[in-house]
Regions:
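Flexible, solvent-exposed loop segments that connect beta-strands
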Residues: 35-56, 88-109, 138-161, 196-207
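Predominantly the C-terminal beta-signal and adjacent terminal strand-loop region
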Residues: 22, 36-42, 48-52, 158-228
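Sec-dependent N-terminal signal peptides
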Residues: 4-13
């Protein structure tokens, strides 16, 4: 019996001599243009979509990633990473307000929390993820005026103060086994779901959402150099 157990252990070592993966860490910087929209539900009030016109704005963030990468091909950059996505993100929602005849930009400085899955296939990278962004502060910008808003003042202006999102990247990535990491440049797409609700327009319901397009710069840390 003991000999059988020892033989089984030796066979296991010979059949599975390689690692299945490694810990991964990264830093990503999305730099994007955002096109916002108001989703309006009419319930007999005075809110009209004709009073607002979407305007493009700029936004970005700084996100840390940590997780585990599963090797698809030994000693080559082919693996899939499952990552926790955490950091700072600035969301902007810009409109031309024809009621006040001015451009207005709602800015939310948010804590970003989510998950991200990314595959590396040689030099080609593909990823998707989702989560929520929780605004902790922000501002309202109009007529060269910046009105700063802390969390309490944001709560006075908006209900349901969190932003569910999904995102997708596709691009190029170079990793070096000797350097223990690499860098990437990707096309970036993000959609912010219509959750944040504007106060003061009752009985109508007015929510913010946006589509974001741009690029993401990434820095990656982890090694796929293994011993056969």
């Amino acid at each position: 019996m003991k000999k059988s157990i020892i033989l089984l252990m030796l066979l296991s070592v010979n059949l599975f001599p390689q690692k299945i993966g490694f810990q991964s860490f990264g830093l990503s910087i999305p730099l994007v243009g955002s096109l916002a929209d108001y989703k309006i539900e009419k319930h007999g009030g005075n809110v009209s979509k004709e009073n607002y016109e979407s305007k493009s704005t700029f936004e970005g963030g700084l996100l840390l990633k940590a997780g585990y990468s599963f090797i698809l091909k030994q000693n080559e950059p082919y693996f899939i990473s499952l990552l926790f996505d955490f950091g700072y993100y600035r969301d902007t929602f810009g409109f031309m307000n024809y009621i006040n005849n001015r451009k207005e930009v709602n800015v939310f400085d948010s804590l970003n929390m989510g998950f991200f899955a990314e595959g590396l296939f040689g030099f080609f990278t593909l990823g998707f993820g989702g989560g929520i962004k929780v605004p902790l502060g922000g501002s309202l910008r109009y007529d060269n005026i910046i009105e700063l808003l802390n969390y309490g003042r944001l709560k006075n202006r908006f209900d349901d103060l969190y932003i569910p999102y999904i995102k997708f990247i596709i691009g190029l990535r170079y990793d070096s086994a000797y350097a223990g990491g690499g860098s990437s440049l990707s096309f970036y797409f993000n959609y912010d779901f219509q959750k944040i609700k504007v106060k003061g327009v009752e009985p109508d319901i007015q929510r913010l959402c946006s589509i974001d397009l741009g690029v993401q710069i990434g820095f990656h840390f982890g090694s796929y150099e293994y011993i056969d």
